Amino acid sequence: MTLLNVCGLSHHYAHGGFSGKHQHQAVLNNVSLTLKSGETVALLGRSGCGKSTLARLLVGLESPSQGNISWRGESLAKLNRAQRKAFRRDIQMVFQDSISAVNPRKTVREILREPMRHLLSLKKSEQLARASEMLKAVDLDDSVLDKRPPQLSGGQLQLVCLARALAVEPKLLILDEAVSNLDLVLQAGVIRLLKKLQQQFGTACLFITHDLRLVERFCQRVMVMDNGQIAETQAVGDKLTFSSDAGRVLQNAVLPAFPVRRRTSEKV
């Protein structure tokens, strides 16, 4: 089943110039893509290529300058109030900058309950039980419930944001560089959790990343983005080989797991 369909999406930002006239900076140009239920897709690209802007459009934080985004066959621009509430539950996003994505004055308990209060019909006791359950799912315990964001490490706060997104049982989870910055142990745990959710609920995942190793370990399909456009799309096999210049640049930038010793035929 197709969850998300993007057709001919373009976007620009207007800013004032020295002449006082508004100038338009193009960020996305004619982007089209689809995401299906249970699918894991990577959006791969260098910083500044338009990945995060596309993500903000997909979750409805901004409206595109041109083109259409459809969720389960319905255009986002035409959703009524009830449909928009359902959409906000169905699609959740975890941002790279976790400290900016939460209220620093709120406790972890309040942060986790927030989407449940607005998007689900659960009693307070049920919300608290699910908050505890979600923390356990991301390898955190109840000891963090009364802490505030400044009291947590960056990795812990990122996991709290992931738990918050998962608390409403979304059909699509968008992770904007949200896993790449975790250490390898935490990253492996998150990947195991997401695979479990896919098997149980058919949750789809869109990884926005520049981490090619993450793509190879977890994703079924990869789209390479460059200068606001999709440069290529391909299935992820045993070994990725890109045809686009942008893809090859990212592939060549990956360091080997261990340093390669150079062999010399002569002793110095």
Curated annotation (Swiss-Prot):
Pfam families according to UniProt: ABC_tran
Membrane topology: Peripheral membrane protein
Residues annotated as transmembrane: none
A molecular function (GO) term: ABC-type nickel transporter activity
Domain ABC transporter: 4-252
Domain of life, per lineage: Bacteria
Alphabetical UniProt keywords: ATP-binding, Cell inner membrane, Cell membrane, Ion transport, Membrane, Nickel, Nickel transport, Nucleotide-binding, Translocase, Transport
Enzyme Commission number(s) of this protein: 7.2.2.11
Top-level EC class: translocase
Coiled coil: none
Gene Ontology terms: cellular component: plasma membrane
Record field: catalytic activity: Ni(2+)(out) + ATP + H2O = Ni(2+)(in) + ADP + phosphate + H(+)
Signal sequence range: none
Subcellular location as annotated: Cell inner membrane
InterPro entries membership: AAA+_ATPase, ABC_transp_ATP-bind, ABC_transporter-like_ATP-bd, ABC_transporter-like_CS, Nickel_NikE, P-loop_NTPase
Protein residues bound to ATP: 45-52
Complexes and interactors: The complex is composed of two ATP-binding proteins (NikD and NikE), two transmembrane proteins (NikB and NikC) and a solute-binding protein (NikA).
NCBIfam families tied to this protein: nickel_nikE (TIGR02769), PRK10419.1 (NF007739)
Task performed by this protein: Part of the ABC transporter complex NikABCDE involved in nickel import. Responsible for energy coupling to the transport system.
Family: Belongs to the ABC transporter superfamily. Nickel importer (TC 3.A.1.5.3) family.
Record's protein name: Nickel import ATP-binding protein NikE
Organism of this sequence: Shigella flexneri serotype 5b (strain 8401)
